[in-house]
């Protein structure tokens, strides 16, 4: 409750000025489940302008949706006005938002009953839609009619599968039937929003269960490049995903499992950042080499330790012989390298040019690469004079 107590000052201020205010959403759900709590959100009867007037330290992030970020003791909290939403456009966004004074109306518009629970500053639970019962049964149940909820915002179906992975809950029967029936509506959703949910699925502690449910509901058929991957996704669900430490590893392993031959094309279609694409592809390339050889000084140096550690964790899962000491050995080997990046070499291209009358050209990079390899193999000291002597001895200038 400590984190709620800090945010409770916001609720107290709102109530002192005649407004209702409650903790809502995922933080309340996770508090009931006894999971680590993420962002704490507050719903209130106060209008956005009233919230901003009461809290000088604020950021008006989404006034059209009634959301103001209030800074309390240096922590940001989303404070959102009770609202209802009118007819949805394109199965993804409401045509308009109306602010209301009723908590029940606000909770009624939410996706799942476990996310439609409110709590006051004293820890008293307000559960109008059976969210606690669903949590007790470990079930994911829509608020009201499942078909209506998914037609309002089709992303809710993907969120349902994501919660299977992150919470280990099961889909309630009517909720699952509605996903099977309306899965095609997911094609109306921006891929960026789907990617966020899919990544949470891949990194969830119950990822195997989530992947199985993705196939059982046929939702995978409405995701880019996955329509023909049913058996491969089920095969991926046979492995132990718990060893992965980053989402990069999870994506690299998933792409390996589905046999994606053009990972950068897949990732661009899923709207990944160039940085993330580069990392995932680098891990996949390292795994490809790792399948045919052990780590050595040159391979590890060229790969870089962070990519190498991720690649080794994925490789260990692939061969189903996960060995933590092998991963630790990669770090030890890297720590023992005479140099860990080219900038640490005690010679540069300018040095080479100053030792010869040759004009600059590709030969400079070639010689530097040979020096680099000799140092890494510990056949040459990383000292300028020793390097110069070796170059002259080998007639490389």
From Swiss-Prot:
<feature type="binding site">
    <location>
        <position position="26"/>
    </location>
    <ligand>
        <name>ATP</name>
    </ligand>
</feature>
<feature type="binding site">
    <location>
        <position position="159"/>
    </location>
    <ligand>
        <name>CTP</name>
    </ligand>
</feature>
<dbReference type="Pfam" id="PF13735">
    <property type="entry name" value="tRNA_NucTran2_2"/>
</dbReference>
<comment type="similarity">
    <text>Belongs to the tRNA nucleotidyltransferase/poly(A) polymerase family. Bacterial CCA-adding enzyme type 3 subfamily.</text>
</comment>
<dbReference type="InterPro" id="IPR050264">
    <property type="entry name" value="Bact_CCA-adding_enz_type3_sf"/>
</dbReference>
<feature type="binding site">
    <location>
        <position position="110"/>
    </location>
    <ligand>
        <name>CTP</name>
    </ligand>
</feature>
<feature type="binding site">
    <location>
        <position position="156"/>
    </location>
    <ligand>
        <name>CTP</name>
    </ligand>
</feature>
<feature type="binding site">
    <location>
        <position position="159"/>
    </location>
    <ligand>
        <name>ATP</name>
    </ligand>
</feature>
<dbReference type="InterPro" id="IPR032828">
    <property type="entry name" value="PolyA_RNA-bd"/>
</dbReference>
<dbReference type="Pfam" id="PF01743">
    <property type="entry name" value="PolyA_pol"/>
</dbReference>
<feature type="binding site">
    <location>
        <position position="162"/>
    </location>
    <ligand>
        <name>ATP</name>
    </ligand>
</feature>
<feature type="binding site">
    <location>
        <position position="153"/>
    </location>
    <ligand>
        <name>CTP</name>
    </ligand>
</feature>
<feature type="binding site">
    <location>
        <position position="29"/>
    </location>
    <ligand>
        <name>CTP</name>
    </ligand>
</feature>
<dbReference type="InterPro" id="IPR043519">
    <property type="entry name" value="NT_sf"/>
</dbReference>
<dbReference type="GO" id="GO:0000287">
    <property type="term" value="F:magnesium ion binding"/>
</dbReference>
<dbReference type="GO" id="GO:0000049">
    <property type="term" value="F:tRNA binding"/>
</dbReference>
<keyword id="KW-0548">Nucleotidyltransferase</keyword>
<keyword id="KW-0694">RNA-binding</keyword>
<protein>
    <recommendedName>
        <fullName>CCA-adding enzyme</fullName>
        <ecNumber>2.7.7.72</ecNumber>
    </recommendedName>
</protein>
<dbReference type="GO" id="GO:0005524">
    <property type="term" value="F:ATP binding"/>
</dbReference>
<feature type="binding site">
    <location>
        <position position="153"/>
    </location>
    <ligand>
        <name>ATP</name>
    </ligand>
</feature>
<feature type="binding site">
    <location>
        <position position="162"/>
    </location>
    <ligand>
        <name>CTP</name>
    </ligand>
</feature>
<keyword id="KW-0460">Magnesium</keyword>
<feature type="binding site">
    <location>
        <position position="29"/>
    </location>
    <ligand>
        <name>ATP</name>
    </ligand>
</feature>
<dbReference type="GO" id="GO:0042245">
    <property type="term" value="P:RNA repair"/>
</dbReference>
<comment type="subunit">
    <text>Homodimer.</text>
</comment>
<dbReference type="InterPro" id="IPR002646">
    <property type="entry name" value="PolA_pol_head_dom"/>
</dbReference>
<feature type="binding site">
    <location>
        <position position="39"/>
    </location>
    <ligand>
        <name>Mg(2+)</name>
    </ligand>
</feature>
<dbReference type="GO" id="GO:0004810">
    <property type="term" value="F:CCA tRNA nucleotidyltransferase activity"/>
</dbReference>
<keyword id="KW-0547">Nucleotide-binding</keyword>
<dbReference type="InterPro" id="IPR032810">
    <property type="entry name" value="CCA-adding_enz_C"/>
</dbReference>
<keyword id="KW-0819">tRNA processing</keyword>
<feature type="binding site">
    <location>
        <position position="110"/>
    </location>
    <ligand>
        <name>ATP</name>
    </ligand>
</feature>
<comment type="function">
    <text>Catalyzes the addition and repair of the essential 3'-terminal CCA sequence in tRNAs without using a nucleic acid template. Adds these three nucleotides in the order of C, C, and A to the tRNA nucleotide-73, using CTP and ATP as substrates and producing inorganic pyrophosphate. tRNA 3'-terminal CCA addition is required both for tRNA processing and repair. Also involved in tRNA surveillance by mediating tandem CCA addition to generate a CCACCA at the 3' terminus of unstable tRNAs. While stable tRNAs receive only 3'-terminal CCA, unstable tRNAs are marked with CCACCA and rapidly degraded.</text>
</comment>
<feature type="binding site">
    <location>
        <position position="41"/>
    </location>
    <ligand>
        <name>Mg(2+)</name>
    </ligand>
</feature>
<dbReference type="GO" id="GO:0001680">
    <property type="term" value="P:tRNA 3'-terminal CCA addition"/>
</dbReference>
<keyword id="KW-0692">RNA repair</keyword>
<keyword id="KW-0808">Transferase</keyword>
<feature type="binding site">
    <location>
        <position position="156"/>
    </location>
    <ligand>
        <name>ATP</name>
    </ligand>
</feature>
<dbReference type="InterPro" id="IPR023068">
    <property type="entry name" value="CCA-adding_enz_firmicutes"/>
</dbReference>
<dbReference type="Pfam" id="PF12627">
    <property type="entry name" value="PolyA_pol_RNAbd"/>
</dbReference>
<feature type="binding site">
    <location>
        <position position="26"/>
    </location>
    <ligand>
        <name>CTP</name>
    </ligand>
</feature>
């Amino acid at each position: 409750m400590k984190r709620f107590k800090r945010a409770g000052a916001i609720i107290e201020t709102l109530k002192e000025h005649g407004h209702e205010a409650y903790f809502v959403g995922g933080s309340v759900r996770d508090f009931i489940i006894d999971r680590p709590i993420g962002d704490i959100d507050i719903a209130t009867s106060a209008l956005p302008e009233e919230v901003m007037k009461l809290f000088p330290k604020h950021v008006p992030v989404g006034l059209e949706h009634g959301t103001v970020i209030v800074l309390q003791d240096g922590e940001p909290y989303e404070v959102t006005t009770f609202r209802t939403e009118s007819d949805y456009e394109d199965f993804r966004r409401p045509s308009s938002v109306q602010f209301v004074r009723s908590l029940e109306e606000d909770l009624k518009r939410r996706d799942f009953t476990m996310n439609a629970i409110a709590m006051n500053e004293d820890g008293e639970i307000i559960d109008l839609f059976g969210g606690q019962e669903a949590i007790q049964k470990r079930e994911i149940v829509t608020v009201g009619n499942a078909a209506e909820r998914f037609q309002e915002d089709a992303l809710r179906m993907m969120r349902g599968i994501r919660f299977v992975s992150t919470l280990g809950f099961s889909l309630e029967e009517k909720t699952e039937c509605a996903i099977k029936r309306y899965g095609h509506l997911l094609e109306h959703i921006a891929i960026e929003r789907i990617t966020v949910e899919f990544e949470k699925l891949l990194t969830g502690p119950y990822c195997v269960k989530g992947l199985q449910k993705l196939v059982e509901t046929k939702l995978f058929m409405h995701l880019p490049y996955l329509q023909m991957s049913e058996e491969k996704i089920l095969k991926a669900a046979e492995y132990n995903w718990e060893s992965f430490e980053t989402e990069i590893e999870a994506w690299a392993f998933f792409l390996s499992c589905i046999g994606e031959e053009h990972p950068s094309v897949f990732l661009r279609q899923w709207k990944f950042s160039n940085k993330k694409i580069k990392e995932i592809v680098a891990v996949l390339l390292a795994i490809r080499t790792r399948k045919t050889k052990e780590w050595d000084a040159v391979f590890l140096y060229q790969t870089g330790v962070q990519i190498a550690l991720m690649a080794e964790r994925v490789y260990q899962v692939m061969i189903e012989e996960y060995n933590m000491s092998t991963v630790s050995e990669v770090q030890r080997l890297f720590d023992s390298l005479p140099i860990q990046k080219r900038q640490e070499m005690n010679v540069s291209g300018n040095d080479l040019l100053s030792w010869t009358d040759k004009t600059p050209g590709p030969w400079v990079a070639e010689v530097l690469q040979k020096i680099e390899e000799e140092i890494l193999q510990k056949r040459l000291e990383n000292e300028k004079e020793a390097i110069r002597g070796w170059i002259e001895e080998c007639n490389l200038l």
